């Protein structure tokens, strides 16, 4: 974990306002996560049109099995998914070139996802479905938006730049 944090911190040190992507999502395509990320992506297209989404399945067999068994994936297209994990350097590049990170925790997940930790280290804004995030000391409404099924585009999150958090918390 320590090595990951150091890489994300280096990304945060380079932060600029020159973004290739308005947001990114890199993660395993769990059925409900897929559904939420797709829904968020669609709702954000008008203000965040430059999107990088990398849905990962560990194998094609898992993809076909889940597509048949999970209603959230019935309409999913094969070309939306990747069957090789994103390598570290490519992942760093995507985070570096993104304004914001999308996150959707799995059902029943307790605690933070790696995307939350990465966004904090890289000093990126974060949109998440994790309701518990407001209870953490690093929570800042300028940086973290709690998604509850729809977006309030007048929210301070969309009107402000990333606000640095106190190093004591970080």
Which stretches of residues belong to each language-model region?
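Nucleotide-sugar donor-binding catalytic core of glycosyltransferases
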Residues: 1-109, 113, 125-139
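Pol beta-like nucleotidyltransferase catalytic core
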Residues: 101, 121, 125-170
